Amino acid sequence: MADGDGEVSALVCDNGSGMVKAGFAGDDAPRAVFPSIVGRPRHQGVMVGMGQKDAYVGDEAQSKRGILTLKYPIEHGVVSNWDDMEKIWHHTFYNELRVAPEEHPVLLTEAPLNPKANREKMTQIMFETFNVPAMYVAIQAVLSLYASGRTTGIVLDSGDGVSHTVPIYEGYALPHAIMRLDLAGRDLTDNLMTILMERGYNFTTTAEREIVRDIKEKLCYVALDYEQEMANSLTSSQNEKNYELPDGQQITVGNERFRCPEVLFQPGLLGQESVGVHETTFNSIMKCDVDIRKDLYNNIVLSGGTTMFPGIADRMSKEITAVAPSSMKIKVVAPPERKYSVWIGGSILASLSTFQQMWIAKAEYDESGPSIVHRKCF
């Protein structure tokens, strides 16, 4: 992957709790998008000589899910199992992108407020296991903002494992005002599993959960007025949709369609103490300097797969208008490519000429050790 002037393109790898997005800097979309899953056989090899692997990664794990136990090495946006994480990176470089990592600088992404030890471990694995020539760790929400063409704004980044509101001013995240909400796509999937059970549909295994995730992605939406929508659903069935399961049977989904994502705005429905995404965003803005709040209200950027529900931007706008000062201009931006905006921002950043002196080079790592990441990546 060399450019005309002999430069090697950087690799950009956005490791989400649910999906890995990976590709080459300068591209406008990731080449590889696959689930962040490592699967191990549930039963010892029945068929001798079938060449069964001890672990499967990504789509292969997904397709063999019937015989595997699936584990996600990234929980709530933070890596919790480094051995599995290494398998995912290995799979990304060698099987998905088909590159030799020792030949390319690598840009990785991390959750806001990622523990220091985690950044060091990422750095160490990249340099020592994969022998990369250079690497950098960027905060996910900041990359999403770059992808939307802004340097100031507040990003609501909601993925599969965690949601964050991150105020950013002139390209720098304001750590004191970042809020984290442990409520995201996976919780919505679990919630949908629960409310579908009330209808008598039983989904329990890790494999069946993936079916429910698909129902969520295809059929759910956010109601502008939840109470009103609930009332409507009790009187008419025009909101009902059918979904065909892998075995061909049809199930009917009604008010579950908007009840599922409603917990983003009312975590109380799940029995969670926390406040909803709109209030979290508002609290984040209020923690910022009074002079920059106007710029934040006017640049609320949605990012991540869990912001893909139809109706979410309008609802967000409505809820924030209700709590903000009445004269304040409020703008919620929901870019169509927001599912991949973290990756796209990484692709933009890693191909900027001004960024080239920001990389941590192998020589610097050899000299200073893993702690170099705190000095060079902020």
Curated annotation (Swiss-Prot):
Keywords assigned by UniProt, alphabetized: ATP-binding, Cytoplasm, Cytoskeleton, Hydrolase, Nucleotide-binding
Reaction it catalyzes: ATP + H2O = ADP + phosphate + H(+)
SMART domains per record: ACTIN
SUPFAM superfamilies reported for this sequence: Actin-like ATPase domain (SSF53067)
Gene Ontology terms: cellular component: cytoplasm; cytoskeleton
EC number: 3.6.4.-
The keyword DNA-binding is assigned to this record: no
GO MF: ATP binding; hydrolase activity
CDD domains named in the record: ASKHA_NBD_actin (cd10224)
InterPro entries named among the record's database cross-references: Actin, Actin/actin-like_CS, Actin_CS, ATPase_NBD
Subcellular location: Cytoplasm, Cytoskeleton
Top EC class, one word: hydrolase
Signal peptide: none
Family: Belongs to the actin family.
Functional summary from the UniProt entry: Actins are highly conserved proteins that are involved in various types of cell motility and are ubiquitously expressed in all eukaryotic cells.
Protein known as: Actin
Organism: Scherffelia dubia (Green alga)
